[in-house]
Design a protein with these regions (language model features):
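Active-site environment of non-heme Fe oxygenases that use a 2-His-1-carboxylate facial triad
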Residues: 1-31, 36-37, 41-263
Length: 263
């Protein structure tokens, strides 16, 4: 994590060898940071469409991340955000890729945090097989609701494919509802969930860094959990814009660039 290369944006970035290296690193590590991206309003949509197709949601084609009154999500406050994945309530899957573009950031605090859910899952399996088994087999209800929208989905906190391989994590404690189950199983489940949360919040797995204006972070929302430290909105401005993409379009871009550069 700590040796991830930062990339530099340029006018010829879209079909460049730099873009190819960016996508290779993204699929290897789960996130990349691109510097010197123009801070024009909603430029991240243009960037997103360079590498795939921006996915429209109930939040729009893109969304603003800044403190505001009466928010429908904690992201729109100055509070700290513990590690989580976005949109776990979408069916069948949450958006695969999230882009966050820093427009302004002159506050104290407000650092970005990332946790590799795949690494945590592997370590949880070694630490306690029973916890791993119950978290990969118990579906919980995820729900989002505001005055305009209700979204629900049932899924495991850790989803495996039919061969038992890691597929994705869905973790957002404010949005999940545990189903009814026998008391003994429920106790194991809550202990397992707490253990998982403790791992996600451990300094051993978390990296913390500051996004500066012009920095754009692209992360795998199926693998990476993200968060932020708290900040004081009275000290300055912290303004990011975000959007989502799906894997098929970025994988197509990667294949196109591999063919172009004979790799």
């Amino acid at each position: 994590f700590k040796n991830i290369k930062n990339f530099k944006f340029s006018d010829k970035f879209a079909d460049s060898n730099e873009m190819l290296n960016l996508l290779i690193n993204f699929y290897k590590y789960g996130f990349v940071v691109i510097q010197d991206v123009p801070t024009n309003n909603n430029f991240l949509v243009k960037f997103g469409n360079m590498i795939g197709s921006v996915k429209r949601t109930n939040f729009g084609e893109y969304f603003n991340v800044k403190s505001k009154p009466n928010p429908n999500d904690l992201a729109y406050t100055a509070l700290s955000l513990s590690p989580h994945t976005d949109n776990p309530y979408r069916n069948p899957f949450p958006p695969c890729i999230q882009i966050l573009h820093c427009i302004e950031n002159d506050v104290k605090g407000g650092h970005s945090t990332l946790v590799d859910g795949f690494t945590v899952t592997e370590d949880l399996k070694k630490l306690n097989q029973d916890y791993y088994n119950i978290l990969t087999s118990t579906k919980v209800r995820f729900k989002f609701s505001d005055k305009d929208t209700i979204l629900e989905s049932w899924a495991e906190l850790i989803h495996l494919d039919e061969k038992g391989n890691f597929q994705n994590v869905r973790f957002s404690p404010r949005l999940d509802y545990v189903p009814q189950m026998k008391r003994e199983k429920l106790e194991i489940y809550y202990n397992a969930r707490k253990c998982l949360s403790d791992l996600y919040n451990s300094d051993e797995y978390r990296i913390e860094f500051r996004l500066m204006p012009g920095d754009l972070m692209m992360m795998d929302n199926h693998r990476l959990l993200h968060g932020r430290t708290s900040f004081d909105p009275n000290e300055g401005n912290r303004f990011l814009q975000g959007c989502y993409l799906d894997f098929d379009s970025t994988e197509g871009k990667l294949l196109h660039l591999r063919r172009k550069f004979n790799l």
